[in-house]
């Protein structure tokens, strides 16, 4: 029967999304009972989800591979096989305490600080995550909230902090959940009248990591339970690390008291990576895959794919897969040919009209005013921001950008770009506006 479980798991990996397999199925430990298998899960959340979503398929596969589909689920760790008694020795050896079995909290061990590519857009988030791992529960960064658009590395930093905490303290109980998982587990607990058990899960952990808390918006009971969970962990000096797709105060449907709690610790924006960081990410990901990527190809991808890390990885995966399939070397020409449709879609997603509309909406302006010849400060500054964003995020030339702004001269565009760059060094509000607009345009 034990030989059947790895084969069963391999089939499940092919049938279900990778994140689901990693979250719910990989933590399971199998014990052979002769005529059946017991699958041990690290907590009741996983037991409930496996029973509800995967158990029928697991039984089918085990029946196919082992001729018997009898499966039981339990919370805990697989019992260790008894060791033979040691032969007697003349000297008495002092007994040693058995090591504590590590807590399987759904952490992906692949994500570490070592393989996180640091850049200007994420260096504060990286420093904060390292501090949270080194000094868990410290009020200076508890809770630690990382916010920004999808695919910028928030979850990587969250996993890295959890893995570093576990490395420093192997017995630490670190639990990672997506917000949907917290919600689903709470609903199941309500249905089963098992809320006491649901709450006890969080009393036993050292750190709680929850992804995408914007999902809690509008779910009053979920927010209430998370509010009480948050208070208990915070009072117990247990580390809380959260991610959100925007600054929590901007999330409609989150209760004011929860927004207030989230502001107690440290909130850090993770912005889209700049060109140098994007190129470094492409080269680093290529090394991880054992692929040979020339620098000029990495620069091409970094120049064209501006939105997020996930898109960079997608472009790289496409390139490497086609190179392996065709046996061709990866060159700039090969990359342009392979990624042609992807790069075209990227350019269309962030065009000058989209930038103009986003900037006008952000500053509460009419489009006709943004493009007008009027030079009042309330119009001139947003107009310069829009021009600078067009230069930063598109491949259009200065004359083309000027034409899109009611036929302005290319020198006007150049002046706007230089002016905004200079002002952002001293004007924190303008820098904040710029970063928010970048995030909006990258969504």
Swiss-Prot record:
ATP binds at residues 151, 153-155. One of its GO terms (biological process) is DNA replication initiation. Residues 324-443 are annotated as: Domain IV, binds dsDNA. Residues 76-105 are annotated as: Domain II. Keywords: ATP-binding, Cytoplasm, DNA replication, DNA-binding, Lipid-binding, Nucleotide-binding. Residues 106-323 are annotated as: Domain III, AAA+ region. Disulfide bonds: none annotated. Domain I is involved in oligomerization and binding regulators, domain II is flexibile and of varying length in different bacteria, domain III forms the AAA+ region, while domain IV binds dsDNA. This is Chromosomal replication initiator protein DnaA. It comes from Xanthomonas oryzae pv. oryzae (strain KACC10331 / KXO85).
């Amino acid at each position: 029967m034990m030989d059947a479980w790895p084969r069963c798991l391999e089939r499940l990996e092919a049938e279900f999304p990778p994140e689901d397999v990693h979250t719910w199925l990989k933590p399971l430990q199998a014990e052979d009972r002769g005529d059946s298998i017991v699958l041990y899960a690290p907590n009741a959340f996983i037991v409930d989800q496996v029973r509800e979503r995967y158990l029928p398929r697991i039984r089918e596969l085990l029946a196919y591979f082992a001729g018997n589909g009898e499966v039981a689920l339990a919370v805990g760790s697989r019992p260790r096989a008894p060791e033979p008694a040691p032969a007697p020795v003349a000297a008495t050896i002092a007994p040693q305490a058995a090591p504590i079995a590590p807590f399987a909290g759904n952490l992906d061990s692949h994500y570490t600080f070592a393989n996180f590519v640091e850049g200007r857009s994420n260096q504060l988030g990286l420093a904060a995550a390292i501090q949270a791992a080194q000094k868990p529960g410290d009020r200076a960064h508890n809770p630690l909230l990382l916010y920004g658009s999808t695919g910028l590395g928030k979850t990587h930093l969250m996993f890295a902090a959890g893995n570093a905490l576990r490395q420093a303290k192997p017995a630490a109980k670190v639990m990672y959940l997506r917000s949907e998982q917290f919600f689903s587990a709470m609903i199941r607990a309500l249905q089963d009248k098992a809320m006491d058990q649901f709450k006890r899960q969080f009393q036993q952990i050292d750190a709680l990591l929850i992804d995408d808390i914007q999902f809690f918006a509008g779910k009053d009971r979920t927010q209430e339970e998370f509010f009480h969970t948050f208070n208990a962990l915070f009072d117990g000096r247990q580390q809380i690390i959260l991610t959100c797709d925007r600054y929590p105060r901007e999330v409609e449907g989150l209760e004011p008291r929860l927004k207030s709690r989230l502001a107690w610790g440290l909130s850090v924006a993770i912005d889209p990576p700049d060109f140098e960081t994007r190129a470094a990410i492409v080269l680093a990901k290529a090394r991880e895959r054992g692929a040979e990527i020339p620098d000029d190809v990495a620069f091409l991808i970094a120049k064209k794919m501006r939105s997020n890390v996930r898109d960079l990885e997608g472009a790289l995966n496409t390139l490497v897969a086609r190179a392996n399939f065709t046996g061709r070397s990866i060159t700039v020409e090969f990359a342009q040919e392979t990624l042609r449709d992807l790069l075209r879609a990227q350019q269309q997603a962030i065009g000058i009209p989209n930038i103009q509309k986003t900037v006008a909406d952000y500053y509460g302006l009419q489009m006709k005013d943004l493009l007008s010849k009027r030079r009042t400060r309330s119009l001139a500054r947003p107009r310069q921001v829009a021009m600078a964003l067009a230069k930063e995020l598109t491949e259009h030339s200065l004359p083309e950008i000027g034409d899109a702004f009611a036929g302005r001269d290319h020198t006007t565009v150049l002046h706007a770009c230089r002016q905004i760059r200079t002002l952002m060094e001293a004007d924190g509000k303008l820098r904040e506006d710029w970063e928010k607009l970048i995030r909006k345009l990258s969504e």
